[in-house]
Structures are given as structure tokens and as C-alpha cells.
């Protein structure tokens, strides 16, 4: 079992990256949101989930930049009919908080994703509603990301992963300008990344 991997991103594709760890390239599947903070040459640390694909006799690695996304995948794959690939598709469309809210509010439209039929959506809502409400009430630091603030800070030259790690702590009800102002103060200790 692999708990996490740290390395340099060698290649970025539509649903995965190749992460170079001590000159070994690992194919790691990521959600679209996690892929947004990966670029060639960046150094990252990913939490890892391992999935054995018995039909193809292979093992696939799924990576996460935060524990919330990893926890969501673990919950989703416990639902009968939800594969790792399907769970990653869900996490590519919805943030963990959006997913939790969709389940708690029984929002079938939010969960409408390619490959998810009505029966599977109902099963996800039914099987996870109790578990999600417990997680939500126990996790006070769980906020969605302000994408406008992320984009603005990256355009100012700050590294994507540092921007993401900084902004994910802020409450969503803050104005974008306030988030940027607060993040700039926190990021001022970091060097500006002059590579585009």
C-alpha cells in the first residue's frame, strides 16, 4: 500500500499525470480540480489510493491534494456500482462540499454526471446521506475554493499549489477582493514564481 508520493510532475494528461519519484514515473489519476494545480516541473505531494483492476491485472493509483477529496472517494466507492473512475468523475465536477450538499439536499440534478443513471444517483444519496451529515458537522474548516481569487493570484506569479493551499482555508462568504488581500499577506513569505 502507498500512503502518499512526493515528486516532480513530468507529464500532464486529461485525467492523469506522470509523477517522477526518484527517477520512477508513476501514472496517477486525478480529478479535474487536482489537475488544475499540476504543471510540468512542479513539485507536489499527493495522498494516494490504490485500486487493483483484476480484469486488466493492473494496479491504478489515484491521487489527491487534500484529505477532503480523498475522504469523498473512499465514501463514494463504498456505494455499490460506483467505481474509482466514476468517483473521480464526480469529484471532477463537484468539490467535496458541493458533493456533500447535493447528497444532504437530495439534489439529483447536481449529481447528474455522464455515466451516472437515476438508480445509481438514488443509491448514492440513500447510502451516504447519514455518513455525509456526520462528516459535515464535524468538519468546520471545509470550504469551497474561490476560483476567481485563485486565478488572480496565479496571474500575479504565485505558484498554483501554494495559492490553492492558502485559499482553501478561507470561508466562501468572504468577498473575492478580501480573499485576495488576505492571501497576498500570507503568500508574501513565498517567492514569486516567475515561470508561467
Swiss-Prot record:
Q: Where in the cell is it found?
A: Cytoplasm
Q: Which InterPro entries match?
A: DNA_helicase_Holl-junc_RuvA_I, NA-bd_OB-fold, RuvA, RuvA_2-like, RuvA_C, RuvA_C_sf
**Family in the record:** Belongs to the RuvA family.
Q: Which GO cellular component terms are attached?
A: cytoplasm; Holliday junction helicase complex; Holliday junction resolvase complex
Q: Kindly indicate whether the keyword S-adenosyl-L-methionine belongs to this entry.
A: no
**Where, by residue number, does the polypeptide cross the bilayer?**
none
- Signal sequence interval, chain numbering: none
**Region feature (Domain III):** 147-196
Q: Which domain of life is it from?
A: Bacteria
Please list where the region (Domain II) is annotated: 66-143
Q: Tell me the segments the record calls region Domain I.
A: 1-65
Q: Regarding domains, what does the record say?
A: Has three domains with a flexible linker between the domains II and III and assumes an 'L' shape. Domain III is highly mobile and contacts RuvB.
Single Gene Ontology MF annotation: ATP binding
Q: Which cysteines are disulphide-bonded?
A: none
Coiled-coil region(s): none
Query: Region Flexible linker: which residues?
Result: 144-147
Protein name, as recorded = Holliday junction branch migration complex subunit RuvA
Where mainly found? cytoplasm
Q: Kindly state a single biological-process term from the GO annotations of this entry.
A: DNA repair
| Protein role | The RuvA-RuvB-RuvC complex processes Holliday junction (HJ) DNA during genetic recombination and DNA repair, while the RuvA-RuvB complex plays an important role in the rescue of blocked DNA replication forks via replication fork reversal (RFR). RuvA specifically binds to HJ cruciform DNA, conferring on it an open structure. The RuvB hexamer acts as an ATP-dependent pump, pulling dsDNA into and through the RuvAB complex. HJ branch migration allows RuvC to scan DNA until it finds its consensus sequence, where it cleaves and resolves the cruciform DNA.
Q: Which UniProt keywords apply?
A: Cytoplasm, DNA damage, DNA recombination, DNA repair, DNA-binding
Record note on quaternary structure: Homotetramer. Forms an RuvA(8)-RuvB(12)-Holliday junction (HJ) complex. HJ DNA is sandwiched between 2 RuvA tetramers; dsDNA enters through RuvA and exits via RuvB. An RuvB hexamer assembles on each DNA strand where it exits the tetramer. Each RuvB hexamer is contacted by two RuvA subunits (via domain III) on 2 adjacent RuvB subunits; this complex drives branch migration. In the full resolvosome a probable DNA-RuvA(4)-RuvB(12)-RuvC(2) complex forms which resolves the HJ.
Amino acid at each position: 500500500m502507498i500512503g502518499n508520493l512526493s515528486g516532480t510532475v513530468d507529464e500532464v494528461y486529461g485525467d492523469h499525470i506522470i509523477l517522477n519519484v526518484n527517477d520512477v514515473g508513476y501514472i496517477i489519476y486525478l480529478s479535474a480540480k487536482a489537475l488544475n494545480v499540476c504543471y510540468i516541473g512542479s513539485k507536489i505531494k499527493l495522498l494516494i489510493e490504490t485500486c487493483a483492476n483484476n480484469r486488466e491485472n493492473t494496479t491504478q493509483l489515484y491521487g489527491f491534494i487534500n484529505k477532503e477529496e480523498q475522504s469523498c472517494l473512499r465514501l463514494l466507492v463504498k456505494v455499490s456500482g460506483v467505481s474509482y473512475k466514476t468517483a473521480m468523475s464526480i469529484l471532477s465536477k463537484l468539490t467535496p462540499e458541493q458533493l456533500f450538499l447535493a447528497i444532504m439536499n437530495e439534489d439529483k440534478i447536481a449529481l447528474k454526471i455522464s455515466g451516472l443513471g437515476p438508480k445509481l444517483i438514488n443509491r448514492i444519496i440513500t447510502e451516504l446521506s447519514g455518513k455525509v451529515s456526520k462528516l459535515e458537522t464535524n468538519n468546520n474548516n471545509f470550504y469551497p475554493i474561490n476560483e476567481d481569487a485563485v486565478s488572480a493570484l496565479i496571474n500575479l506569479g504565485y505558484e498554483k499549489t501554494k495559492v490553492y493551499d492558502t485559499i482553501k482555508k478561507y470561508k466562501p462568504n468572504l468577498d473575492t477582493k478580501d480573499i485576495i488581500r488576505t492571501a497576498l499577506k500570507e503568500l508574501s513569505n513565498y517567492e514569486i514564481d516567475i515561470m508561467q
